[in-house]
Amino acid sequence: MTRLEKFYQEKVVPALQKEFLYKSIMQVPTIEKISLNIGLGVASQSNKIMEEAISELSLIAGQKAVITRAKKSIASFKLREGMPIGCRVTLRKERMWDFLDKLMNFALPRVRDFRGVSENGFDGHGNFTLGIKEHSIFPELEIDRIENTKGMNITIVTSAVLDSEGKVLLDLLGMPFKK
C-alpha cells in the first residue's frame, strides 16, 4: 500500500463520508485509473520522435506505452487511417497511486509560474483532465537528453458521480487547485 493510498483510506474516506453523508463506505468515490496521453500529430511521421515519446512516457509512467493510431483518414491533416499519431498509458492500482503522488508533490510544483491547476478540467461526471505543456517536469527524465519538448494530457478517472464530489476527493488528496 502506497503512502497516498494509505492517506486516502485513513483520512480522506472518513472526511468524504462525513461531508456527503454516505451511508455505506462503498459509496465514497475513489480514483479508478489515470490515463496519460501524448499526441504528436504531424511529428509522429518521424519514427525517431515517436520512439522518443514512447520511451519517455514509459519512463514517466513506469509501464510500457502503446502507440495510438488514427481511426479515420483526414485529407486536410495528411492523415490516413492506421497511421501512428501518439502514445498512451493507463495506470491502475499501485502504479496509479505512485504516479498521482509524484504528480502532485514533485512534478506540478516544477512547472514555471505555477499557481495551481484550474478547476475547469472536470467533465461533468467527476473525472478530471489537465494538460501539461512540457513533459520535462517529471523527475525521471534528464533534461539534457530531451530533444523535443512534448505536451501531455493526464486524465484522472474517479468513481464520483458529480464534479463536486470529484473536486473534494482530489482536494483532500492534495491536488493543488487555484484558490
Swiss-Prot record:
The keyword Thylakoid does not apply. Transmembrane segments: none annotated. It holds the Pfam family Ribosomal_L5_C. Keywords: Ribonucleoprotein, Ribosomal protein, RNA-binding, rRNA-binding, tRNA-binding. One of its GO terms (molecular function) is tRNA binding. GO terms for cellular component: ribonucleoprotein complex; ribosome. One of its GO terms (biological process) is translation. PROSITE patterns: RIBOSOMAL_L5. It comes from the Bacteria. Belongs to the universal ribosomal protein uL5 family. Part of the 50S ribosomal subunit; part of the 5S rRNA/L5/L18/L25 subcomplex. Contacts the 5S rRNA and the P site tRNA. Forms a bridge to the 30S subunit in the 70S ribosome. This is one of the proteins that bind and probably mediate the attachment of the 5S RNA into the large ribosomal subunit, where it forms part of the central protuberance. In the 70S ribosome it contacts protein S13 of the 30S subunit (bridge B1b), connecting the 2 subunits; this bridge is implicated in subunit movement. Contacts the P site tRNA; the 5S rRNA and some of its associated proteins might help stabilize positioning of ribosome-bound tRNAs. This is Large ribosomal subunit protein uL5. It comes from Lawsonia intracellularis (strain PHE/MN1-00). The gene is rplE.
